[in-house]
Amino acid sequence: MRTDNDQWDITISVGQTALFVAASRALEARKPHPLAVDHYAEVFCRAAGGDWVAAVEGTDPEHPLQTEFGVDFVNFQGARTKYFDDYFRRVADAGVRQVVLLAAGLDSRAYRLPWADGTVVYELDVPKVLEFKREVLRRHGATPTAERREVPVDLRDDWPAALRANGFDASQPSAWIAEGLLIYLPADAQELLFAGIDALSAPGSFVAIEESAPMPMDVFEVKRAEALASGDPNSFFALVFNEQCAPGEQWFSERGWTASTTTLNECLHEVGRPAPAPDSEAAQMTGSISLMWARKG
């Protein structure tokens, strides 16, 4: 179960969820007609070794990504990745040259998207996650397509100061992303995160988030109790918070941003992928998720 000052690397707790997502992106990239291609996702999984290699090779039929849930989850990751990739292309076309990846994890967009000259990508995450990513990509010989600046910081600490210390200019437009992040923050921390984004964003800035509507608390408590009883500290329901400070579109619209939200199931439909069956394990998850982007001013 999470604590106020818990720490992690790429193999435990919140950190290992980045590998699960990377394995999903790797499986999406292997499809005949992928929604998004992230070749580095498989590189990360192979570097982590063990079950993660089996996950991307599909050689372990018991791995969660080989189940019905896994098929739905890979579709989810393909659609989500495409949504945010398209967002960053709009951002680049609008002339924004500062990009901030909050809880960057194993996001490889600084290496795989065609950024305009002069773009700086700031990657915020805990030091051990950034170290793993840096070393794996260095050994692979990867070269970023923008100037990449690591900002080793826990988002529960003073991350705005750390971002500024690494050269971020709040007087210039910026583009932000919180992908796969908010469920790991309690509502008060979400509020602080949104406020920090708003305070550092000049007119013409953009933000994109993935958010989940909380499930009924009695349902969540049962799932959390089952997760804790399993003895697996990395179980999903032992890591997440069932909280939301406010729907993102509402929060940012009240502060002068123009926002647009789509549900994940709508996004799946738009890209030609099926939503999970109503009685499936993934249905509650995808049915609660929305994707939003907004522009300030």
UniProtKB/Swiss-Prot annotation:
Pfam families: LCM (PF04072). GO terms for molecular function: methyltransferase activity. S-adenosyl-L-methionine binds at residues 125, 154-155. It comes from Mycolicibacterium smegmatis (strain ATCC 700084 / mc(2)155) (Mycobacterium smegmatis). Keywords: Methyltransferase, S-adenosyl-L-methionine, Transferase. The keyword Transferase applies. This is Putative S-adenosyl-L-methionine-dependent methyltransferase MSMEG_0614/MSMEI_0598. Its EC number is 2.1.1.-. Exhibits S-adenosyl-L-methionine-dependent methyltransferase activity. InterPro entries: Ppm1/Ppm2/Tcmp (IPR007213), SAM-dependent_MTases_sf (IPR029063), SAM_mthyl_Trfase_ML2640-like (IPR011610). One of its GO terms (biological process) is methylation. The lineage of its organism: Bacteria, Bacillati, Actinomycetota, Actinomycetes, Mycobacteriales. PANTHER family: S-ADENOSYL-L-METHIONINE-DEPENDENT METHYLTRANSFERASE YKTD-RELATED, S-ADENOSYL-L-METHIONINE-DEPENDENT METHYLTRANSFERASES SUPERFAMILY PROTEIN.
